[in-house]
Amino acid sequence: MDFAPRLRQACRKPIPGEGFMPMTLAFFVCAVVTLISAVVSLGFSLVAILSSEDDARNQALYAAARSFAFLLLSLVPWLTGSVSWLLAAAWGLIVVQALDAGIGHRLGDRIKTWGPLGVSAVNLVAVFWLMLVGS
């Protein structure tokens, strides 16, 4: 039994002002990568909260608040199918991860440099793919 047509139909999401748009593979991949990036960012923020005290903990709380906002932003495309929301979330997280890579480089930590840089690069490729498919 071929589930692809049924899956495509189930993934049709309304976009205000744009009618219905099918969730393409490019949209799905970009949305997954963006969501993973947001979850990882929030995870690191939560670890920082739990492992720090006083002023450092306060700063970690601010970082977690911003990470949580990005998580919410990255969930909107799943609920609406909006390419615009997805691109906004993806571009924001690309910048955040690239800046995190810069911080990791400054600290001299390869994992904190290459991990975020890799996620940022994968998200960037997914965004370009989505933009090519959507045009």
Regions found by a protein language model. Give the residues of each.
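Hydrophobic transmembrane alpha-helical segments in integral membrane proteins
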Residues: M21-V39
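Cytoplasmic-side transmembrane-helix entry/capping segments in multi-pass membrane proteins
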Residues: R57-A60, K112-S120
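Membrane-helix boundary connector in multi-pass membrane proteins
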Residues: T80-V83, L87-A89, L99-G115, S135
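Core segments of alpha-helical transmembrane spans in multipass integral membrane proteins
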Residues: T34-L46, R57-L79, W91-L99
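Juxtamembrane boundary at the C-terminal end of a transmembrane helix
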Residues: A126-S135
